Amino acid sequence: EEPYLKNYHTFMGAIYQGRYAAGVAAGMKLKELIDDGIISESEAKIGYVGAYPYAEVISGYTAFLLGARSVVPHAVMTVKYTNSWNDYRTEKKYARELIDEHCIIISQHSDTAGPATACEETSSDVPVYNVSYNQSMLDIAPTTYLTGCKINWKPYMKSAIDAVLNDKVIEKHVKGNV
């Protein structure tokens, strides 16, 4: 039997749900650009800067693309991995490469403002929009920021801390709203 420590508990949020909703917002922007004649249907391309090619990142960008495709079924996506959680220069560089490859929306599963900065600094005829992760990028990308997704850990942490303080079991499955 595995050793058990009463004060040890692991947890993780289902961020893919928020990524799906953010993808819907991205799809709505793509549709608006198509309907306004700014881009053609074949130009509905999304770029995604991911940290590492593992399950959480893959499920996140898959959910994001599915959300976008719920509005624009022919949207496509290119993913570039930085192999780091926190590398501003590489994240910005890869976002710029995706923009150079004609991506209209850039999202990320990495931890810096590099992708948002790349979107804001772009000087192309077609605007490039940013969908962030874990924090708003409105102050960094005021003209290109669309939306973002993050987990609100406060309800879970409050529940877990209350359980520990009151010598109760921390719930194994806690559901919240997206």
Regions inferred by a protein language model and the residue ranges of each:
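A residue-level marker of the well-folded mature domains of exported/periplasmic proteins
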Residues: 1-178
